Amino acid sequence: AIIIGADQVCCTQSGIVLHKPGSADRAIGQLTQASDQWLTFYSSLVLIRNGAVAWSGVESCAVKLRRLTNPEIRDYVMVDNPLWSAGSFHAEGAGLRLIEKIETTDINVLYGLPALALLQALRELNDPLTYASPI
């Protein structure tokens, strides 16, 4: 068996980490700071086999947010409740409306699981998913 672990962090261009906010006020503050800026999402991936790290890596995704108004930010946070999301938004939900541009080789990195890297790692470990396996 292989244990798969993944997590994500978001950074501004100036290197400030936008942690999972935990509160609406912090989410509003982060989105206000990130408005009209490029953000980089880093998604880590670790595979454990027989109690040892068998594979690890980090993939990135660059996201440019639109220029957001204060009411738009408040409304978004109240509706989508992104309190446990790096960067304070859910790109797979209503947060997609906040985005102007995305640059990545794997969109799944933005969602927190670098799926293409995971599939490559499983192939390298001779444990690939079959087409009958759900992803």
Question: What residues fall within each predicted segment?
Answer:
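Anionic-ligand binding patches
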Residues: 1-135
